[in-house]
Amino acid sequence: MEIQFDEPKKSLRPKKVNKFKGRNKKSETRDKFVGVRQRPSGRYVAEIKDTTQNIRMWLGTFETAEEAARAYDEAATLLRGSKTRTNFVTHVSYDSPLASRIRHLLNNRKKGTKQQDMNGISSTTSHADTTNDTTSDGSTSSTTNCIGTASGAINSTSASGVTSTSTNISTSASGVASTSTDISTNSSNTNVNDKSESLLSSSTTMQKPNLFEDAYRPDMSNLTNEYESSSYKSNVSWDFGPIFDNFPFDQWLDMTNNDGLLCDMVDKGVSEFERMKVERQISASLYAINGVQEYMKNVQDCNEAQWNLSPLC
């Protein structure tokens, strides 16, 4: 058997024909002439730019592209010289109305740039002057302030030195015065103390003989006899003879026996001070007698031993 393979039929596609678009008139004119552009209305405009002087100048509107290109060539040669790129080989006539207009525009442009430059320079100079003035004013004020503060410090230091010296002098003077017053007060105190001591010593020396002279001496013979009898009973030997001689028992007994005399003395106008003095002396003598009796009782109660006491002077 024969096997037959059917080959698929190839579909024939039509070849694409590349259609090249022709150049547009606008693009042709734009690429053909330098410095020329066409408006939507169909007219042509010529303008020039100068990057060195930052100038963009509108040269005018023309009906054809060639006229606009020639205007550009004249402006370019006037601005940049004869070696610049132009659309045509042209000879520039300096008396043409385009050349005069270009000169007028260039002069105005140069004046404007100069004016701007002058304004910028004046503004910078004025700003610099103001800054200099402010700095100079600040420096002068600071210098004057420094001078003022320095002078003030000198004056204050001098014044403080004067005041300190004056205060030191015053304090030293006050110290001398205080020392002198202390010395005087000490001397006066010592004088007063000496005087008081002398007065006290004289008063004591004057009072001692008066006390001994005015002391009463009562008669203690009965007491001595009773004491001797009691001492014999207790087998204790006592010797108080000289002691009782020192006490003014005789005068005390005389005063006790003479109470009427005391009343008479009071009636006669004896001063109250003397009466108090006499009463004090009587109380002192009674205290001495009571002390002796208590001492004797204590001695008798202590021991039965014999005591040999030396006479008290």
Curated annotation (Swiss-Prot):
Tissue/organ expression: Expressed in roots, root hairs and leaves. Expressed in root epidermis and root hairs.
Region (Disordered): 1-29, 108-143, 157-204
Inducers of expression: Induced by Nod factors in root hairs.
Family recorded in the similarity comment: Belongs to the AP2/ERF transcription factor family. ERF subfamily.
Protein name per its UniProtKB record: Ethylene-responsive transcription factor ERN2
Biological role: Transcription factor involved in symbiotic nodule signaling in response to rhizobial Nod factors (NFs). Binds to the GCC box (NF-responsive box) of ENOD11 promoter. Acts as a transcriptional activator of NF-responsive box-containing target gene promoters in root hairs. Involved in early stages of root nodule development. Functions redundantly with ERN1. Is essential with ERN1 for the initiation of root hair infection, and nodule organogenesis and development. Required for accurate expression of the NF signaling genes ENOD11 and ENOD12.
Biased composition (Basic residues): 11-24
PANTHER family in the record: ETHYLENE-RESPONSIVE TRANSCRIPTION FACTOR ERN2, SHN SHINE , DNA BINDING / TRANSCRIPTION FACTOR
GO cellular component, one term: nucleus
Keywords of the record: DNA-binding, Nodulation, Nucleus, Transcription, Transcription regulation
TM regions (residue ranges): none
DNA-binding region: 32-89
Biased composition (Basic and acidic residues): 1-10
Subcellular location: Nucleus
Low complexity compositional bias, start-end: 122-143, 157-193
Native source species: Medicago truncatula
Gene Ontology MF: a single term: sequence-specific DNA binding
GO BP: any one term: nodulation
Pfam families assigned to the protein according to its UniProt record, in alphabetical order: AP2
InterPro entries per record: AP2/ERF_dom (IPR001471), AP2/ERF_dom_sf (IPR036955), AP2/ERF_ERF_subfamily (IPR050913), DNA-bd_dom_sf (IPR016177)
